[in-house]
Amino acid sequence: MIDLNADLGEGFGRWELTDDERLLSVVTSANVACGFHAGDAATMRRVCELAAERGVRIGAQVSYRDLAGFGRRAMDVPPAELAAEVAYQIGALEVFARAAGTRVSYVKPHGALYNRVVHDEGQAGAVVDGVRLADASLPVLGLPGSRLLEVAEKAGLPVVTEAFADRAYTEEGTLVPRGEDGAVVTDPDAVVERSVNLARLGVVDAHSGRRIPVRARSLCLHGDTPGAVELARRVRSRLEASGVRVAAFA
């Protein structure tokens, strides 16, 4: 079994980045922007309502406070401040989730914060503190072997490992930085093949060409890539044709 998640609600005001409604007909979990890197109150409410109608799980995609940089700029935020901001984002999304008749089911960091907590125990601890402040029962979604999942597990939080079909990997199992050539896999056929290999075999071909183990319960497809909806449909169809059950982890 594998969960399919995508980043949604990443518009702001009249500007829309992702085709939320169509993607929600394919994925099983939605990482909803909570206003710090993208998203606003109206967008958060609408995505929660659409997700609830389709039975899609809602996750809080928490970020550094960085609207101008889409949450992809490295920042040094004091741990206490970061913990408060993580809790704030979860709480804001929870209001709209409950109004739609559902709830926030998990938490996933975004962008620079996601990459930072792979190695930085202090920032990872701040994220975990923020999750515990909001709801200590919430699972944390992250990269296998990351400091985030280690700290979360020690703190008693449920953890869920995640893999990326459309991102390049280093041989160490981390993501190739977006600024490097080939960091994003754009060939649809390659993304589909990588998805099946990750779900069935627990492996992926690293940027170097070496095949590495990546065990994950959830597979992320980015909603802001060209042709994201059709690609997501192809991935899900191929997974199911390969005998993989696609269902939410939460």
UniProtKB/Swiss-Prot annotation:
Reactions accelerated catalytically: 5-oxo-L-proline + ATP + 2 H2O = L-glutamate + ADP + phosphate + H(+)
EC number: 3.5.2.9
Keyword Nucleotide-binding among UniProt keywords: yes
The protein's assembly and partners: Forms a complex composed of PxpA, PxpB and PxpC.
NCBIfam families: PRK05406.1-3 (NF003814), PRK05406.1-5 (NF003816)
Family in the record: Belongs to the LamB/PxpA family.
Protein's name according to its UniProt entry: 5-oxoprolinase subunit A
Gene (name only): pxpA
